[in-house]
Amino acid sequence: VTASSDGVLSDIKVLDLSQGVSGPFCAKFLAGLGAEVIKVEPPGTGDSSRHSEPFLGEGDGVESSALFAYLNTSKKSVTLDLDIPDQARSVKQLAQGTDILVESYAPGYLESLGLGYDTLSEANPGLIYVSVTPFGQTGPYRDYKGGDIVAQAIGALMYTIGLPDREPLKVGGESVLYTTGISAFSAAMLALHVRDAEGFGQHVDISAMDVMTVAQIHSSINEQFGHTPVRRPTNLVRAKDGWVSPGLESGVQQGTWPKVCELMGVPELADDSRFTTQEARRTNQQDLLKVVGDWAATKPKEEIYHTLQALRTITGYVATVEDLLVARQLVDRQFFQTLPDPVHGDVVHPGAPFRMADDAWRLLPPPRLGEHNEEILNGRLGFPTRNWPKSLTLAGRSLSATTNKPALQGLRILDLSQVAAGPYATMFLGFMGAEVIKLESRSRMDINRGRAKPGPRDPRVYPDGEQGERPYNRTAHHVHRNINKLSVTLDLAAPKGKELFLGLIRVCDVLVENYRGSVMDRLGLGYDAVSEANPQLIYLKISSQGATGPEANYGSLGSTLEQTAGLASITGYEDGLPLMTNEVYPDPVVGILSFGALMAALRRRRQTGLGCLVDLSQREVTSMLLGESVLDFSVTGRVAGAMGNKHRDMAPHGVYPCLGEDMWVAVSAGTDDEWLGLCLAIGQPELADDPRFKDTGSRRANHGVLDEIISSWTRGSDHYRVMHLLQAEGVPAGAVLKGSETIVDPHLEARGFWDTVNHPEAGIYKQTTTPWILSKSPRQPAVPAAGLGEHNYQVLGGLLGLPTSEIDALVEQGITGDVPDPSA
């Protein structure tokens, strides 16, 4: 591997055989890092997404889809029919010179054409073969059809979204398919990291169901600890021009509430017992929202956002796609980029999902169908099989073998992150074999740990509701998100604590933190300081708004990110207000992407010998889930809104009641064949000839009638039974599962998705693992989350060489220890 100014993947060739959303999104990210991506499309029709709304111009030509244009930037397009043997052989020849192949066909289809992993890897042992499918390559559902709404249902993300008295609701747009693509990207980068080190390629198995089960970061663990999942009303209040989330129930510093009261012109409420503490404000949320709503009704939403953020609250506002393009933070960071289009003029695209040193993110216009046939098919085919670097041979490594050692063995991570996004990223690193040292302060523990001692009205979830003697070691979120980590405490405000921190920096490869913009700089421990201590260190900064810009010090929660990134503006019932997920959806998305960003930074270090700063904005990443709507608005001026559970291209597409209390099934029919299958499954084949439902447009126009017909059938059966009956007829469908149901789902069990953890203080529970399976780099077993400071002596003594007596003295001084500061 050699360094290049053209991107960390400039030496990598990618063959993109995928269609739709997830696989192409994965390949788009690889192209953004500099890889040459050759997209193979069917002649005439092209990728299925070329026919997906919204369209940038009149008609639905193959060059007009905003979705295709967004997903396929910086790629080359060739047309080949895989069912024609000569053309399949051309694909096989292309694969011989390929580093990464991405595909999304039904399991077994490419194998039947001689294009499966086993066949292609014989000629190209270093090939990384990424399969992205609804249910993965194994398990009883592997041949089932999927889609965005099906994955949200079967992965339990959907169950807690929406209002208590209505059907569960999907996250708007194609966001889940995008997240599946991000998982594929991160897994591909992991496999490339292994190949760079060991020489062999492997098969990467990505299942949208796995990804969504990872993404429901509350339900599965909370239900095991005795918490009942619910759909909750929103906490939004109406501003003059939209909606805001005041953010006064959590994350508010002591002393802020009186300032807010003064600002709102109600100073008398500063001492009102309903609102004086965070717990009181949570208990009296509706009264609080009434007070704030009266004040907010006459003010613009962004003014409220900036005013309250200046008081250190975690406030959000529901940004529309139109708002995003003029949001001052995104404009200042030049997140959106304009690309020329020969037909539609200038088209605005979301830019880089993360920033790595001064490396540019490659963003070029999407290809026209078959644009590169002459260059690739007529000019390049016939090139010799790839010559692997001699260094691999000299090292005596077999390209086809596996070492059976953990993928990230020898990599050491210092983890300062809290809450969800950062801990999720480092949890994945631990699962793949990295040594992760979680660093906290006794006075400022990870928020996931909760309280220093038991107390009343604690909103966190504990096993069977019992806080225990050490509640900080047994909260659901702590034990779930901090698997496979060591725990160390240091007071970073103390000179000795800073000295020891820099000592750890010198022996670590990666630092991960997700504080507000300038926190580490104020401590004197920002990137300049740590890179001076260790020039090879990779510093991953995950922040709400990014490391730069006028809002760099603004805070957020997953729910407010859904608002400011625009996701809430396209999520909701058709006749209602914007809604957020109850799974803080941006956090797992960012956690999964952060893993891939680190793999890219490690490859850059391999090339240059130097570490770097990786700047990842959670708002920017989340806004990428609305990519096609951004493009559409920039050309047509259309502002995307909520569609409930409906879809632009499919009908029927919704969630339907089943037998039992609050039981549901998600169903989507995107083709005439799937519609016919649905008619057969419900025992009404005559509907296939009904003029009201003759094509997708007719079915969309009569969606309400269809919903009644389908609901009358689904009500009489169990949600799993409905799913299986529909899938047997080739209809995409998924039971809307609770988190507790995913734990016993036979497909996830067959895929080995869950690990059983026996935590010394929280008991036995099932743990989510990783959103990928690598054929030669298995994940490591889950090791229970550590108690606070459990490894102080092991790490400070073993890594830094401190004698036990000195660590004892540090405990006496309060610089380290295994019990919280009483004020925590």
Tell me the role of every PLM-derived stretch.
Residues 181-202, 214, 218-224, 259-267, ...:
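Oxidoreductase and adenylate-handling cofactor-binding alpha/beta cores
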Residues 233-311, 315, 322, 328, ...:
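Aromatic-enriched alpha-helical interface/lid elements that frame and gate functional surfaces
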Residues 44, 134-136, 208-213, 241-243, ...:
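Glycine-rich beta-alpha junction loops
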Residues 347-385, 765-804:
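C-terminal active-site "lid" helix and adjoining low-complexity regulatory extension at the edge
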Residues 68, 224-229, 234-236, 251, ...:
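Short Gly/Pro-enriched turn/cap motifs at secondary-structure boundaries
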Residues 168-179, 231-234, 243-248, 276-279, ...:
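A short glycine-threonine-serine/GTX helix/turn-capping micro-motif
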Residues 1-200, 223, 368, 372-610, ...:
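N-terminal helix-loop segment corresponding to the beta1-alpha1 unit
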Residues 310-363, 728-782:
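A glycine-rich dinucleotide-binding beta-alpha-beta segment and adjacent secondary-structure elements
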